[in-house]
Amino acid sequence: MFTIYTYLAPIVAMVLVVLNYLISNNNSYIEKDGPFECGFTSYQQTRSAFSVAFILVAILFLPFDLEMSSILPYVVSAYSNGTYGLSILVIFLLSLVIAFVYEINLGALNLERRYTPIVKPLMNKLYL
């Protein structure tokens, strides 16, 4: 039975792809190849730099998300792990808390910072 499905599934998929190609309408014109941005055509550069705070939050999300997936096996088998498993979990969580407190003390999570270019004082000196 499995071999029938193994041979039948690719055949059905190919038949559906060929039918889609034969039956579908293909209206290709220049507007389909152009950029679409919120319903209007952009006439200037619309790319702006990402906020550093956004990237910082995204990067800091990864270790704490991995922390949750690392805790899950302990939660599932908490009764069979005993004291040894609990001590390993506490050491793991303690190391993450220490790292988080260190980041706070460094000011890495201060999202109110604004980027000030280094060139600005130089430009003031050149124009004055």
UniProtKB/Swiss-Prot annotation:
Keywords: Electron transport, Membrane, Mitochondrion, NAD, Respiratory chain, Translocase, Transmembrane, Transmembrane helix, Transport, Ubiquinone. It catalyses: a ubiquinone + NADH + 5 H(+)(in) = a ubiquinol + NAD(+) + 4 H(+)(out). It comes from the Eukaryota. GO terms for molecular function: NADH dehydrogenase (ubiquinone) activity. One of its GO terms (cellular component) is NADH dehydrogenase complex. It is an enzyme of class 7 (translocase). It is a multi-pass membrane protein. InterPro entries: NADH_UbQ/plastoQ_OxRdtase_su3, NDAH_ubi_oxred_su3_sf. The chain crosses the membrane at residues 3-23, 52-72, 84-104. The keyword Transcription regulation does not apply. Its main location: mitochondrion. It is found in: Mitochondrion membrane. The keyword Mitochondrion applies. Its EC number is 7.1.1.2. Belongs to the complex I subunit 3 family. Core subunit of the mitochondrial membrane respiratory chain NADH dehydrogenase (Complex I) that is believed to belong to the minimal assembly required for catalysis. Complex I functions in the transfer of electrons from NADH to the respiratory chain. The immediate electron acceptor for the enzyme is believed to be ubiquinone. This is NADH-ubiquinone oxidoreductase chain 3.
